[in-house]
Swiss-Prot record:
Gene3D superfamilies: Ribosomal protein L31
Sequence positions that bind Zn(2+): C16, C18, C37, C40
Family: Belongs to the bacterial ribosomal protein bL31 family. Type A subfamily.
Cofactor: Zn(2+)
Record-level Gene Ontology MF annotations: metal ion binding; rRNA binding; structural constituent of ribosome
Assembly description: Part of the 50S ribosomal subunit.
Cofactor binding annotation: Binds 1 zinc ion per subunit.
Organism from which the protein derives: Shewanella amazonensis (strain ATCC BAA-1098 / SB2B)
Protein name, entry field: Large ribosomal subunit protein bL31
Gene: rpmE
Single GO biological process annotation from the record: translation
Length: 70
């Protein structure tokens, strides 16, 4: 690597809204505040919810279904 062209790395703290604190190396230089992390993200915790959009589709077809028929 060429000397003098790379940004300096510093250890920062990334704090999640769930209270999880992660120490990482970064070039940002200041602490980060996260909305979600691996400890509270629904995909990783297994608390995913299936969103049923059937009601929305029926509502759309009810409002605009007659426009397509001639």
């Amino acid at each position: 690597m060429k000397p003098g062209i790379h940004p300096e790395y510093a250890q920062i703290t990334a704090t999640c809204t769930c209270g999880n604190v992660i120490k990482i190396n970064s070039t940002v230089g200041k602490d980060l505040h996260l909305d979600v992390c691996g400890a509270c993200h629904p995909f990783y915790t297994g608390t995913q919810k299936v969103v049923d959009t059937g009601g929305r589709i029926d509502k759309f077809n009810k409002r605009f279904g007659m426009l397509g028929k001639k």
